[in-house]
C-alpha cells in the first residue's frame, strides 16, 4: 500500500476517533521477549483503532530501538545497565533455570526462587530509575494518560498508576505457584481439582496427586517468594510515603487479562474482572518466502516438520544437536529447524537450518505434519490454532506444565531434552505423525479456539477501552481485597460461632448439673424423711 493511501486511512481513523470521543492515551510499562510480543499485538490493535500508545522502556531494553520508525511512541529512560549486559544476564539466568535438576522438589524451587529474586532486583532497579527521575516523571504526568497497561510479572506499572492516579490493566500468562494471581488478584484455585502451575499435574488427580498438589499449595503460599517482597514493600512505601506492600498495590488492578483459554487450561472459577485472552496473537498463515515454499513443496505427500525451541535458547551443546539431527534425518518428512549454531555432523539432507522461521505461517501450511516445540505458550497456541500435533521438549518455567496440558488433551508427546536419545525423539515424532488420534485431538482444540463469539484480541482491546471510558472498573473488583486473611477465610466468624456454641454447651451443662443436683437433693431429703 502506498504512503498516500496509508495516510488517508490513518486520517479517517483519527477523524472517527475524535468525532466519537473514544480516542484514549495508553501508557505501557515495557516487558521483554515473549512477554512483549503478546503485549505488542494488543498495542498494534489499539493503534489501529486510533488510540495513542506510549511505551516506557529503559535504555538497556533489548527489543526497543528509539531510531526505528513505529506508530508506537517510545519514551526511553536512562539506566546504568547496557543492552548487552541485560541480554547476557537474562540468557545466563535462563540457562541456569533450564539446567536445574528436578530430582529434589525443595532444591529445585529454592533455586527458582533465587533466580526470580534476581530478576526482581533488576526490575526494581529500572523502577527506581524511573520514579527517581523527576524531570522524566513530570513529562509523563503532564501527558495525562487514561490507562496504564503492563505485564504483571514486571512490577512498577501499579506504582506509576498510584502516583499518577490512573487506572491500570494487567496482562499475565502465569506467576510461579499463582503467587500474584492469588495474593494480588484474589483468584480462587481450589486445590482439590486445580493443579498448581509448574506442578505438571492435571485436573484428574489421584489421592496421592492431590496430596502432592496440597504440598505445592502450602509451599507456594507460606514459603516461596516470587521476588524479595520485603525490598519491594519497603521501596513502594518510601515512594508513596505511607506503609504499603507490592501485593496490596497490585491488587488495585482494574482488569486482569490472562493469556490462557479453556481449551488449554484446566477449568477453575474466575472473578468478574478477569478474562481469558489466550491465543490473541494467532492469525491465518501468510505465504512463505519462495525458497522456503519450494522446500516445503518438495516434501510431497510426506509433508514437513517444524522445529523451534524459541527465541530465548541460543546455545545448544554439539552432542545434543547431533542427537536431534540424527533423529530428524531418519523421518521421511522434510524438516525446517530454527537453529542458531554450528551445523551438526549428523544433519540429514531432509533438514534445513534457519536462524529465524515464520513459525505461524509454517504451522498454518497444509503440508505441516508436526511441530517440535519447547512448550512456550505462544507456540502452543499457534499449533492449536492451526491444528498441528506436537512433540514437546520443555526447558524451563511453565513449559513442562504446558506440555503436560497438551499430553492430557491427547495432542502432544513429551521427551526430555537432557536425557533423550535419537530413538526417543524419532519414536515420538512417528507417534504424533502416524497415530491419527493426535491430529484428531488437536483439531478438536482448534475448532474450540476458533468457535468464540468474540476473538481474544478484540476482548483484550475491549477491556482496555472499557477501563478508559469508565475511568476504571472498580465495580468488578471483589471485596476480598478489603479483608484481612482471617476475615477472608471467615476465621473470626468461625471463632465467634465456636465461642457461642461453647457458651451454649457450658450453660446447658451447668443447667443440667444444677437440675441433677436439685433432684438428687430432693430425693435424698425424701429418703431421710
Swiss-Prot record:
Q: Where in the cell is it found?
A: Endoplasmic reticulum membrane
Outcome following mutation: residue 151 to A: Reduced androsterone and tetrachlorocatechol glucuronosyltransferase activities; abolished hyodeoxycholic acid glucuronosyltransferase activity
Extent of the signal sequence: 1-23
Q: Which residues are glycosylated?
A: 67-68, 315
A single cellular component GO annotation: endoplasmic reticulum membrane
Q: What is the effect of changing residue 151 to N?
A: Abolished androsterone glucuronosyltransferase activity; reduced hyodeoxycholic acid and tetrachlorocatechol glucuronosyltransferase activities
Q: Which GO terms describe its biological process?
A: androgen metabolic process; estrogen metabolic process; lipid metabolic process; xenobiotic metabolic process
Catalytic activity, EC: 2.4.1.17
Could you cite one Gene Ontology molecular function of this protein?
glucuronosyltransferase activity
User: Which topology term describes how it sits in the membrane?
Assistant: Single-pass membrane protein
Q: Which InterPro entries match?
A: UDP-glycosyltransferase (IPR050271), UDP_glucos_trans (IPR002213), UDP_glycos_trans_CS (IPR035595)
Principal cellular location given in the protein's record: endoplasmic reticulum
Q: Kindly list the residue ranges recorded as spanning the membrane.
A: 493-509
Which UniProt keyword terms apply here?
A: Endoplasmic reticulum, Glycoprotein, Glycosyltransferase, Lipid metabolism, Membrane, Signal, Steroid metabolism, Transferase, Transmembrane, Transmembrane helix
Q: Which reaction does it catalyse?
A: glucuronate acceptor + UDP-alpha-D-glucuronate = acceptor beta-D-glucuronoside + UDP + H(+); 17alpha-estradiol + UDP-alpha-D-glucuronate = 17alpha-estradiol 17-O-(beta-D-glucuronate) + UDP + H(+); 17beta-estradiol + UDP-alpha-D-glucuronate = 17beta-estradiol 17-O-(beta-D-glucuronate) + UDP + H(+); 2-hydroxy-17beta-estradiol + UDP-alpha-D-glucuronate = 2-hydroxy-17beta-estradiol 3-O-(beta-D-glucuronate) + UDP + H(+)
- The broad enzyme category this protein falls into is transferase
Specify which residues bind UDP-alpha-D-glucuronate according to the UniProt entry for this protein: 373-379, 398
Cystine links in this protein are none
What this protein is reported to do is described as: UDP-glucuronosyltransferase (UGT) that catalyzes phase II biotransformation reactions in which lipophilic substrates are conjugated with glucuronic acid to increase the metabolite's water solubility, thereby facilitating excretion into either the urine or bile. Essential for the elimination and detoxification of drugs, xenobiotics and endogenous compounds. Catalyzes the glucuronidation of endogenous steroid hormones such as androgens (epitestosterone, androsterone) and estrogens (estradiol, epiestradiol, estriol, catechol estrogens).
Q: Which family does it belong to?
A: Belongs to the UDP-glycosyltransferase family.
Protein name, please? UDP-glucuronosyltransferase 2B7
